[in-house]
């Protein structure tokens, strides 16, 4: 049954409908007005969904529908159970949307946010504590999502219409009764926009030069070996290590056997880690470190990786928005967040196109200055490198000292050079330091903290609570008390960093969301060299292809590269205003335009 609304819907809730094999899959859409009241229902075949969505999106522009009629109205917010479930098929059909509300992402925020005054209904809907539709296998995904212990792993959220509508009603009630609904809505809109960006970047793919990748591997490791063998330069380096250890048979890939060989050679180390090995000056150490670096490249981004993740000149990783509890993104496949610098030359634009790359200088310290209202810290970095600004202000002697001090303040370093420098920040930037110190104290006491837009940290687990209870027993030992103090300190360092890293992640989401819309407003390129491998939505217009915490890369027609660069700058400025208003903090960019995305 189809009941079309008389007015343009403010929101459209999508979900699957029950049906038989012979009927084919059907999709239900519930149209809602601005007050959340139902104004219509639509029942259509799954294959008809792209045209329906296209009609709704084009109608907002006064465009022509797929049936040829003129349409006018506001673009709706599409309510998805999970963006990776619904958006990729639309993109494959050449349809993009302006905005959505991702129920899975929003559920994770609302179930924990301190702003939600009545979270019981949302928390009780445990079916929505799940991995995204395109996540890795459970044993991999569990580490990414930080689902509360004891709740178990749920493969996917419900996608049927009634369950989706019920969750949307729960979430709407939680938002409307929150202590600051506006702040919460902003966070959920940014998080949902991030879900759209992740799907779009996977659909478009990162332009990747397979021949250049192979050339780099061959130069560093030797020619591609047959089957699973090691390349010749690695084999030669391994022999160099064995000769220096005077052990011709040691297996360098076995930590236990390698450690035994090192000790037999008089190298007294506790492990085979890079940091441990660097403490020795034995002649075997330098080639061993080189071998380990080669082995990492081969296993993480070698020829097998190239075969699996790059196809038709595109690298398509699986991004996981909100995959880290702070709101940072993770990746459940392809290693998008760990591309080594030596492979960056393989990021190559299509012919007639350019890669526009930009990263933010000192994003987290700037976010700290803005959220704490520390005008002195903001002034130190305004319009320039923040670390150099600390030197000019006389806080520290060198830029390196400034970096060590700031990172120490955000991560809770109390020893070494950082421990000696942090007190200078406390003296010069009391507001910023008070914010992170207060967050750390809350964590030590077992409390939770929130980011600027109200993403709230998870409480300590049962193991932490058990340690604290043991230390407070009348018969507690010194060892019990030491373990409790250590656990409290670890939790304090976590909450100290949570507020800063999480707020920086919110700024980055706002940057992405604004940039995505600015790029979509650029005119389509009508030249003779479309980026066909980027898919039907993006083959003729500038689009995001890569994001890493504080860095974006846009693939743009050469004629639009300067416009794309200006869009990146404007979006960064807009993100700062959106989150922090007129706070005297800027977010300067290191921006470049080229055929390759080489990072120095």
Q: Model-predicted segments: where are they?
A:
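Conserved "right-hand" nucleotidyltransferase catalytic core of DNA-directed polymerases
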Residues: 1-30, 34, 149-153, 160-339, ...
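Polymerase palm active-site segment centered on the conserved acidic dipeptide of motif C
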Residues: 52, 80-83, 220-251, 428-429, ...
